[in-house]
A protein has these predicted regions:
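Membrane-interface "cap" regions at the ends of multi-pass membrane proteins
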Residues: 1-28, 57-62, 66-94, 268-272, ...
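Transmembrane alpha-helical segments of multi-pass small-molecule transport proteins
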Residues: 12-17, 47, 93-97, 128-181, ...
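Inter-helical loop and helix-membrane interface segments of multi-pass membrane transporters/permeases
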Residues: 2-5, 33-37, 67, 72-95, ...
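Transmembrane helix-loop junctions in multi-pass membrane proteins
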Residues: 24-33, 40, 176-187, 208-225, ...
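Membrane-embedded translocation segments of transport machinery
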Residues: 2-11, 189, 193-351, 355, ...
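Extracellular loop-to-transmembrane helix junctions
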Residues: 5, 35-62, 164-165, 410, ...
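Transmembrane helix-boundary motif of multi-pass solute transporters/channels
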Residues: 12-49, 258-261, 276-278, 282-285, ...
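C-terminal membrane-solvent junction of multi-pass transporters and transport-like membrane proteins
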Residues: 92, 97, 369-381, 404-467, ...
């Protein structure tokens, strides 16, 4: 087995874990979800979901990762196999490798858009806004720009992205692979130490600029902050707001991806996980709620008002970040610079997340198949380059893959993590494993949250999503949707075969 790497410093670990969580979702998805679900009406369920679902699942993944570090393994494949003496366990654990791997196939492509936009902002090639009071017409040039660059206006099965879009995707992929090639400490950790402070500096500069904006109607930043933070207790009876809030907590903390488990496997077996996990989550929440919410939402409320902001958010996940904000920046002094800063911030945030999503696959190749770091990254790079052509060129494939692995799959895997650790393995042993050698004491009431409440909430989310989304998803018959499904099936079969090969060469080294 290849000797496993370790983090070089505690601050590097915390920044890397925070970088894993701080991604495009913090600055693109959170503002859209909050604006679409009533601003302050969204924040109460969000905070409750963070305590009852996000933090407990985060600590569970940290504990699973530290458990894996004792055994010399960094993915749920082997960790589940140790915890549950059943041949099926390792195949369930495969979700913790396949989900982040499938997500990063399209995530790096979306990430590359931000690099393209930052470059076009710098050279002044983004669209200008028309003179109109109609919000839809105001944003139309930026909507057309995104459609044109990604080829979404194609009428048939195949998309026709612009050449520069493809070039920026290749550049983005190569940047990710270079960082991964350097390793955990010299690559991921080193990048996090530079990228995370830069993300915060850029976000604070943008937030300060947004707070100085005003509209002819007299709206200012206080209106935007009021929309986000004034509580609406009537929303507590709206199940859709709760589901949206719980879903956002999943995305923002990166639970259910398996990446936290893998990152935690590179700590020493007696290192703290409680404080490290909480510190990483706190950095992430500051980036999302304070910075992410104070840029896109506040700017949009100032320029367009609350009803129009909610309308923009309801029309798509990219509308605030890729359309409303650049349109706003196009109409302020030095707007090109602030637009460049915004998209560069998104790119850095995207990179720190995408390299984390790649790491479980690399850890699997290293730990279970004995690949070297370089060989693992090369194999991963070839796969990602080939597989990314599906979401780049096939209409409907990206949305289909995103639903099954980037939405539904996250909840399924997180449920397996909680059930296997606290029910199948042994809840008392799980609690002992989770609370040992920590710098802070985890309150005992979290034992009941992790054993009963968190799994119960996950089941409720799964049932609700199944009722609300599965019927329409399963009835899709367009070729792009089927290509996305076939891709997931083929990836799963390859994963099963690799596990079979790895365990076949183990000579009884594990439980199966």
């Amino acid at each position: 087995m290849v000797k496993r790497e370790q983090w070089g410093s505690r601050i590097g670990l915390i920044l890397a874990v925070a970088g894993n969580a701080i991604g495009l979702g913090n600055f693109l998805r959170f503002p859209v979800q909050a604006a679409d679900h009533g601003g302050g009406a969204f924040m109460i369920p969000y905070m409750i979901s963070l305590i009852l679902l996000g933090i407990p699942l985060l600590w569970i993944e940290w504990a699973l990762g530290r458990f894996g570090s004792k055994k010399g393994h960094g993915t749920a494949v082997a960790v589940f196999d140790y915890l549950w003496k059943n041949p099926v366990a390792k195949y369930i654990g495969l979700l913790g490798v396949l989900i982040p791997l499938a997500v990063v196939v399209y995530y790096t492509y979306i990430e590359s858009w931000t690099l393209l936009y930052s470059f076009f902002s710098l050279i002044g090639k983004l669209p200008s806004t028309p003179v109109t009071e109609n919000v839809s017409d105001y944003l139309k040039p930026f909507s057309h720009f995104l459609v044109e660059k990604t080829g979404q206006d194609a009428s048939g099965l195949f998309l026709t992205p612009a050449l520069e879009t493809y070039i920026f995707f290749v550049i983005t992929l190569l940047i990710n692979l270079y960082i991964l090639y350097r390793g955990v400490s010299a690559g991921i950790e080193k990048v996090a130490k530079y990228a995370m402070p830069l993300i915060f500096v850029m976000a604070i500069i943008l937030m300060i600029r947004v707070f100085t904006l005003s509209s002819p109607d007299g709206r200012n930043f206080l209106d935007g902050l009021g929309f986000l933070w004034n509580p609406d207790f009537s929303a507590l009876t709206n199940p859709k707001v709760w589901l949206a809030a719980a879903g956002q907590v999943f995305f923002t903390l990166s639970v259910g991806f398996g990446a936290i488990l893998t990152y935690a496997s590179y700590i020493k077996p007696k290192d703290d996980i409680a404080l490290n996990g909480l510190a990483g989550a706190s950095v992430n929440e500051f980036a999302e709620v304070i910075l992410g919410g104070s840029i896109a939402i506040v700017a949009s409320v100032i320029f367009f008002g609350i009803p129009a902001t909610a309308m923009i958010a309801s029309n798509g996940a990219f509308n605030l970040g890729f359309m409303a904000l650049p349109a706003i920046f196009a109409n302020i002094p030095y707007g090109e610079f602030f637009s460049f800063l915004w998209f560069l911030l998104l790119f850095f945030a995207g990179v720190t997340s995408s390299i984390a999503l790649c790491q479980p696959a690399i850890a699997f190749l290293e730990d279970e198949l004995g690949f070297s770091r370089q060989k693992s990254v090369l194999a991963l790079g070839i796969f990602l380059f080939i597989a990314a052509h599906i979401p780049i060129f096939i209409k409907g494939a990206l949305d289909e893959i995103d639903f099954w692995v980037g939405t539904f799959g996250l909840v399924v895997f997180a449920l397996f993590e909680a059930v296997i650790f606290f029910w199948i393995y042994n809840s008392k042993e799980a609690w002992k494993e989770l609370t040992r050698d920590n710098d802070i004491k985890i309150p005992y009431f979290f034992y009941y949250i992790m054993k009963y409440i968190a799994p119960g909430l996950l089941i409720i989310i799964l049932i609700s999503w199944s009722i609300e989304m599965l019927p329409s998803q399963l009835t899709k018959t367009d070729p792009g949707a089927w290509i996305g499904r076939i891709f997931i099936v083929i990836l799963t079969i390859i994963g099963f075969l690799l596990i079979k090969a790895a365990w076949g060469n183990r000579n009884g080294r594990t439980h199966t």
